[in-house]
C-alpha cells in the first residue's frame, strides 16, 4: 500500500511525515558523524608479537582474534581470543586465555582508546608447558597493565598491551596488528 508523505528540513535534519500511517507517523533523521567507537567496533584477525621483560622475544602468535564492541558512552570493550606462543624463554609453550578489558576511553588528540586496567580485577588463564616454568592457572593482571587501541585510516588495528601477570617478575609487552575479519 502507498501512503502520502511530506519531507521537510535539511539533509542534516530530515523529517518525513506520514499522516495516514498508524494514526500519523513522523520519522526524523539526524545526520551525524559515526563515533570513533562505532568506527572501530568489529571482529578482527591478525598477529600478536610478545616480549617478556626487556630482552626476551619477540614471540609471535599468528592467528589471533579480537572483538571490539562500542558502548553508548563512547568507550569500547576489547575481548582477546586465546593466544598461543612457542619457544618462549623459560616457558617454552605459552597459552594465554581469553579476557575482556572494558571501558577504554577515546582520546581525540592521539586518535586512540586506552585504559589502565591494573586495578580492574581481570584474570587470564596462563598455561606454560615444556619449559622450566610449568603453570596452568588463572592470574590477575597486575600493576602497569595498560591497553591502547588505534585504528589507522587503512583499517589496520593496532593494540598495544603492556601488562604484568600475578607476581611474575617481568612485564609483558604485546603488540597486535590486524584487520576486520571478513
Label each residue range with its predicted role.
Residues 11-42, 96-108, 144, 152-182:
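Edge beta-strand at a domain terminus
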Residues 139, 149-152:
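Helix-rich interaction surfaces within compact, conserved domain-sized segments
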Residues 1, 60-145:
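Predominantly extracellular/secreted and cell-surface proteins with exposed
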Residues 27, 56-57, 65-72, 172-176:
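Sec-type signal peptide cleavage vicinity
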Residues 21-23, 51-58, 85-95, 125-129, ...:
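Short, cysteine-centered beta-strand-loop-beta hairpins and adjacent loop/turn segments enriched
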Amino acid at each position: 500500500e502507498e501512503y502520502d508523505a511530506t519531507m521537510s528540513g535539511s539533509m542534516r535534519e530530515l523529517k518525513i511525515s506520514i499522516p495516514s500511517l498508524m494514526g500519523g507517523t513522523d520519522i526524523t533523521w539526524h545526520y551525524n558523524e559515526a563515533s570513533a567507537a562505532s568506527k572501530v567496533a568489529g571482529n578482527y584477525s591478525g598477529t600478536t608479537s610478545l616480549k617478556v621483560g626487556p630482552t626476551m622475544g619477540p614471540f609471535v602468535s599468528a592467528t589471533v582474534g579480537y572483538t571490539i564492541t562500542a558502548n553508548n558512552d563512547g568507550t569500547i570493550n576489547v575481548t582477546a581470543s586465546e593466544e598461543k606462543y612457542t619457544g618462549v624463554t623459560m616457558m617454552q609453550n605459552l597459552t594465554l586465555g581469553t579476557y575482556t578489558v572494558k571501558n577504554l576511553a577515546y582520546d581525540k588528540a592521539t586518535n586512540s582508546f586506552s585504559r589502565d586496567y591494573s586495578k580492574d580485577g581481570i584474570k587470564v588463564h596462563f598455561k606454560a608447558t615444556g619449559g622450566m616454568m610449568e603453570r596452568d592457572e588463572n592470574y590477575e593482571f597486575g600493576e602497569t597493565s595498560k591497553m591502547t587501541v588505534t585504528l589507522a585510516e587503512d583499517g589496520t588495528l593496532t593494540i598495544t598491551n603492556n601488562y604484568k601477570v600475578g607476581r611474575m617478575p617481568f612485564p609483558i609487552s604485546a603488540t597486535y596488528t590486524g584487520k576486520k575479519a571478513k
